[in-house]
A protein has these predicted regions:
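Short, surface-exposed loop/turn motifs that are enriched in glycine and acidic residues
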Residues: 269, 311-319, 349-361, 365
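Long, compositionally biased
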Residues: 357-382
């Protein structure tokens, strides 16, 4: 008698039936929609962080035979027990032709004609990493032949992709009619709460596991995430809000112009309007324009009092507060603020010029290298 194969018993999704929407797919139960995260990604500081990291990745998207230069390589997979170059398998002439084909395939977006409107490797990477750094969801369609050989790939809007209920044992039976090659579809494109139908065929736009490249950087065991990741922007919601409030507060200073340095209080209660108008005109002629800056006015016959509205150092506190928020935003994305061009005097004073270089290298090892490894693993998988 054949013994039953052991299976995993644990669950990955919210066990409550409340999370089941009956539409065939799961939404990320985070409280923030993908559209909200995309709008946050368009805010200047977040966009600067994301674009900077993507531009750094671009340096590694050209094929390189030199281990010391940035770029990617195509080689035989090495066994865990291999040591150094002595166990590295040399490429034959046939292998080199295969490498040339793979490089061309990547850089042209698949087996496309010259004038097909498909992305090259650099453009493709910009799109999928932008989604990953905003939504923590990288998605791209993979087109294969009948024998499942790779033919094309195309970046897909990650905000439209949802995980189907097919890998939830409670609802998998609903999809049995779609089983193919022993697998059920795993992802679908969703718009306005409904799975999209193809405009030509009328079929649901659903993807089997080998038809959609799918990558999550910040995976979690939290069942309330419903199998989705956790975007950095979810962590930064309050920080980004405070940055916007600070910028709005400072912008209103120039927009409304209602923050004078102080007031002149005329103490003479019985002064006539003519004298007051004459004083106002003399003051304007004597003190206005840049040429009269720092002049000392001399006034006779009028008892005046200056009420200063800028006796405190709130401006300095405001600057430090915004600086602190920017540092927090960069820290969540594992990036040093100096990579964005922010040169803080206190940091330069502490670390010096050599220390600054070490900080940049450390920042790239902490943020750029893990992103490259993640991207490499996703590309190799599909």
């Amino acid at each position: 008698r054949k013994l039953p194969q052991p299976e995993i018993k644990s669950i990955l999704w919210n066990p409550s039936e409340i999370g089941f929407n009956g539409k065939g797919y799961r939404d990320p139960a985070t409280g923030f929609s993908f559209n909200t995260l995309n709008r946050m990604g368009d805010i200047f500081i977040i966009k600067s962080i994301i674009n900077t990291r993507i531009e750094q990745v671009q340096n590694y998207l050209k094929y390189s035979n030199d281990d010391q230069k940035p770029g990617y390589q195509i080689r035989y997979k090495q066994s865990p027990g291999s040591v150094g170059d002595k166990d590295k398998k040399e490429l034959s002439d046939k292998d080199k032709k295969i490498v040339d084909y793979i490089v061309k395939f990547l850089e042209e977006g698949g087996e496309n004609e010259k004038w097909d409107c498909e992305d090259n490797f650099q453009e493709f990477t910009r799109k999928v990493l932008n989604d990953s750094l905003r939504l923590d969801q990288m998605c791209f369609e993979v087109v294969r032949s009948r024998d499942l050989k790779l033919k094309k790939f195309r970046a897909v809007d990650g905000a439209l992709i949802r995980q189907l209920d097919t890998n939830d044992p409670r609802y998998a039976q609903m999809f049995e009619q779609f089983r193919w090659h022993g697998y059920l579809p795993r992802y679908a494109m969703v718009w306005d709460g409904q799975i999209i139908r193809h405009p030509v065929t009328g079929e649901y736009v659903a993807f089997y596991p080998w038809e959609l490249g799918y990558g999550i950087r910040n995976k979690t065991t939290n069942v309330f995430k419903n199998g989705y990741g956790c975007s950095e922007l979810e962590t930064l919601v309050e920080i980004v809000t405070w940055i916007l409030w600070g910028m709005q507060y400072n912008g209103n200073f120039f927009k409304q112009g209602s923050q004078p340095k102080g007031f002149i209080n005329v103490k003479n209660g019985n002064i006539d309007q003519g004298t007051l108008n004459e004083f106002r005109q003399d003051w304007k002629q004597t003190m206005s324009t840049v040429y009269n800056s720092h002049k000392i006015p001399v006034v006779q016959g009028i008892d005046l009092e200056w009420i200063d509205l800028q006796k405190n150092n709130r401006d300095m506190e405001f600057t430090e507060w915004v600086k602190f928020l920017l540092v927090i935003a960069c820290a969540v994305y594992r990036m040093d603020p100096s990579e964005l061009g922010f040169q803080f005097e206190d940091a330069a004073r502490i670390f010096g010029q050599e220390g600054q270089k070490e900080r940049l290298d450390h920042s790239k090892q902490k943020g750029l290298t893990p992103l490259l490894v993640f991207y490499q693993n996703v590309i190799n998988k599909y």
